[in-house]
A protein has these predicted regions:
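Primarily recognizes Gram-negative and organellar outer-membrane beta-barrels
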Residues: 3-9, 94-104, 108-135, 142, ...
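Acidic, small-polar-rich N-terminal luminal/periplasmic segments of exported/outer-membrane proteins
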Residues: 4-104
Length: 323
């Protein structure tokens, strides 16, 4: 896995510090590090919607940060842990997506995006800071905020993701630590009352889209997630592997890997306006039956997962039987 930065270059008696940033992520259950080059180009800068960044074909609710799903089967998840976060993968990210850094100087990245008008505004804020304590040890944090009002009433989105991370990459021992807090707080209007308002707007005098009546005005869905993830690797033994004309290099015989993943999620669904909307005589309410409380609903669900994994990875180059 990536090691510390290079020493400075000497020019006479003066030492010049070389500015260099390396980043990578862990794959295959944390058993392999894959380098990710730092992108300094503006390619794709116009793609600001999280859904299109992750899937070119998708189904979404429209405003930035809202729930979405890929439309292509090949991009749909093969497994899931917490069902209610499946349509918010841009908020509740996985360990394979987390980047680690190694830099010779402190590295800061700020991103801000705004679109109007103010009454229907969308905002995206991203903050990243990373700094090496020494050549092998790095610490940093990232914060992402996405908020939007939406085109229609009760479409407000508030997504937040905060991550504190640290990594130590030695020749024999490596460890990665992460604490992540993620939140998705969304209003859900249940759709417009009558689609004729959209298909034949000349028949109505709503003026703006946010005046069109919707099913719910205070129905909300909030998901909170706290996650602690630690991954470590210990390299065992040494063997010299031939590299042709370039000579030989030292490589470990095997690697013992251990990861601890503590994942805690809560989902809260609320509707505070049932008393105002519910009328048994009309018989056309959004829900055909209400069994508990006709004034409000507050349904909560908690999910906790603890995964403690130990792996033993053999070096194929060191054992001909594994090739």
């Amino acid at each position: 896995m990536p090691q510390g930065g290079e020493p400075g270059q000497e020019e006479g008696q003066r030492t010049e510090l070389v500015h260099k940033v390396r980043n990578w992520h862990l794959e295959d259950m944390g058993s392999r590090a894959d380098t990710v080059p730092v992108d300094t180009l503006s390619l794709g800068f116009q793609v600001h919607n999280h859904a299109y960044k992750r899937a070119m074909s998708n189904v979404q609710l429209g405003n930035i940060g809202a729930a979405w799903m890929p439309a292509m089967v090949s991009q749909m998840p093969l497994s899931r842990h917490f069902l209610f976060t499946e349509s918010y993968t841009h908020v509740f990210t996985q360990p394979e997506e987390w980047l680690y850094y190694n830099s010779t100087t402190p590295y800061t990245n700020l991103y801000y995006q705004y679109s109007g008008p103010k009454a229907r505004s969308e905002e995206v804020l991203g903050v990243l800071f990373s700094q090496n304590v020494n050549r092998k040890w790095n610490v940093g944090f990232s914060y992402d905020l996405t908020s939007s009002v939406g085109k229609y009433n009760a479409q407000k989105v508030d997504n937040r993701n905060f991550r504190v991370f640290s990594s130590y990459s030695g020749k024999v021992y490596e460890i990665y630590g992460n604490y992540i807090y993620s939140k998705a707080d969304h209003l859900e209007n249940g759709g417009i009352v009558d689609e004729d308002h959209i298909l034949n707007p000349e028949k109505y005098d709503w003026g703006r889209s946010n005046n069109i009546p919707v099913q719910f005005y205070t129905a909300s869905n909030r998901i909170d997630n706290n996650r602690l993830y630690i991954s470590q690797a210990l390299k065992i033994g040494k063997i010299a592997v031939s590299q042709g004309e370039s000579g030989k290099r030292q490589t470990p015989l095997a690697t013992v890997l251990h990861s601890l993943d503590i994942d805690r999620s809560r989902r809260l669904h609320r509707i505070d306006e049932l008393a105002r909307m519910y009328n048994e005589s009309e018989g056309n309410f959004f829900y055909s039956n209400i069994y508990a409380d006709t004034t409000m609903t507050s349904d909560s669900l908690y999910y906790t997962r603890v995964a403690n994994t130990v792996q033993l990875k053999f070096n194929e180059e060191a054992n001909t039987l594994l090739r």
